Amino acid sequence: MKERLKNFHHSAVFICLVLAIVLDVILETLGRHSLFKAISYVWNQPLIFLYNCSIIFFTLTLSLLMRKRIFGYCVISFAWLILGITNCIVLGFRITPFSAIDMLMARNTITIIDKYFDVWQIVLIAALLFVALAGIIILFIKSPTVTGNIYRTRTTVFIVATFFCVMLFTRIALNAQTISDNFANLATAYNNYGFVYCFSNSVVDVGIGQPSDYSQDKMLEIKDDLDSVGTTDSTIGEDKPNVIFVQLESFMDPSYVKYLTFSENPIPNFTKLKEECTSGFLTMPAIGAGTANSEFEVLTGFNVAYFGAGEYPYKTILGKQTIESMATQLKLDGYSTHAMHNHDGTFYDRYKVYKNMGFDTFTPMEYMYNLHHTQKNWEKDDVLTGEIMKTLTFTSSRDFIFTVSVQGHGRYPSQLDEENYSYPIKVAGTGDEALDTQWTYYCNQLHEMDEFIGALTERLKKFNEPVVLVMYGDHLPGFKLTDDDVENGNLYQTEYFVWSNKDNLPVEKEDIAAYQISTKVFDMLGFEKSYVQKFQSKYKPGDDNYDDELENIEYDMLYGQRYMYPDGWPYEPTNMRYGIEKISISHVEKGVYVPPVDETAQTASGDAAAGETDTETAVAEEPQPLNGYYIHGSNFNECTFVWMDDAFLSETIYVNRSTLFLPRDDAFEAGQEISIAQVGDDSIDFGVEDTIVYGGDPVDPDVLETNVGTESVISTTEATTEKSTQKQKSGAKSKASEKTTEN
């Protein structure tokens, strides 16, 4: 027996130990993009390195319960390597390392992968994953099997003991402040404490932990203190203004980068406005990524630092939990509340989150028209001017509009497509031609975003209602910058300004945090504030117990007993609508659709015929007529699809803003329900927009629509059946119905 135990320790356990050390060196090399830096980390932080190894060692010991141990070693090692390689790739695009929350973003990431990788790179990644999967399957089949008794009970005891040892090491290291579980800066934490610990911590550290002094008495004491905080005197009089917040993607003043030179100022409008208006630096919670956390802090006044490492509350709690925000507060004051974003509405789960934050409407890209795109296929911000003005005129009440832009988003290309895009701003100074080109691309996006700022303020100057406009950058772009590279010495700082179309705001210069800006604006306008805003108004960072009390407030509202609301939690999800304009069907007609001619293919065919090659090619490339049905209505766009049998029909063809075509060989039956829905790139829909009942095909089979036809349906408003109405209200079994019935 002793000999067997000896062999057990000298073989399997030793293999786990060696593998753990080798894996951690590889993971640190990948994370630091340098073997030398990884070795330096091991040399300078030996205890932290061994602690990280102990975590890997524990995961490897799970293979000791398997008869195919080599297979177990390889699978667990492969899992760690996948995480490390992913972190390596992510750090090539942004400053923030890969964490567990990014895995919740996988669906969103797939929709934008083409903006970060070329087609051949995507194919290569897919091929490598396929080869790896095939290798795992082959390894499982071919790997040797341990024969005899593997002593499961003793092995289990050993694994459990290893787990508790790791937990003990963690507690000792935390108490000794060798490591920390409070990551103010995720990149710095990964650099100081190692990839394995930081990533593992992001898996288990989610939400806000209960503060040690949290109690009903404490929260009621805080409530009583904040109830005494009243409103401030308005700086603009009694006529309450429309309030517009615009969050500018990756927006900064590039002149702060010490080594860059420009052919001209990329952002003259922003420069002028920040000099003339209340403005300052705005400390954001992230660098190069994390848009959702920036808007979370701005909208709520909450400090995201109290949440888990790298956590996005939008993805973990706000999809199922209401929260007080600027929107909920302004609704109490009679405002209509609107959100808009010129990118996918499902990104960061905004389509779920915004209804829990008090918004009446949400207009994502799927409900916008005349979108233009950058070279990297991000939506340009020029569309937002019209959307904001449309929203302002849509309601009779005052409006709160929260806008999130996207044009400045990375990745920034090292080659410019000057044949199809204009790049008037020239940038130099990095000492690297490819990097100069990336900065040139980025600064030209800033220039176009600045033109949007100028166009919007000009339109608002002519608007007949008072408007207060707040603009700010959500975070710095994902370039490899250090604090020493920028004039202000802080990579977490962007800038903001507060402007009024009535020129009736005071001019103040103040540097604040993102979670303070809503309070600052509300104080300027004399608005009634939420509890968090009252706290931010009365206390400032650095005051005694500031962090402790703010953390208690955030915990009480989101995870605690809500002691601050003894009469009950007042916030319910809104019955949020998507878009401002009604998308509707007027009638459906049977017809024939001829797709537009592919000019490129036609030219190629003509060249082939001229060269006396296979002339059949030209015939084959002629567009073939399609039989089916025309769906007529209003406010369609490229995201509008026919919806039938609880699913959208991907074959729907967008013809123009009032016409869709559905290729279909089978005839619709008289009385059949036909619906339309808006569907995003990720195939998630936003619910049924409108439904009609088909009146039947024309009696004369020759009466088919080509350009003009005759109406042959019953309008929804005239004769939609009770069954159809109930179907829209109850929704379908798909994600669309889930969204339309969440309220």
Regions flagged by a language model, labelled:
Residues 2-190:
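Transmembrane and membrane-interface helices of multi-pass
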Residues 44, 48, 52, 68, ...:
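Short, charged/polar micro-motifs that form catalytic or ligand-binding hotspots
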Residues 94, 102-115, 122-123, 200-208, ...:
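Short alpha-helical interface patches
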Residues 103-106, 192-196, 216-219, 267, ...:
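Alpha-helix initiation and N-capping motif
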Residues 109, 243-248:
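Residue-level preference for non-acidic, small/hydrophobic
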Residues 170-245:
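Membrane-interface segments at or immediately adjacent to transmembrane helices
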Residues 230-237, 248, 253-743:
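Solvent-exposed soluble domains appended to multi-pass membrane proteins
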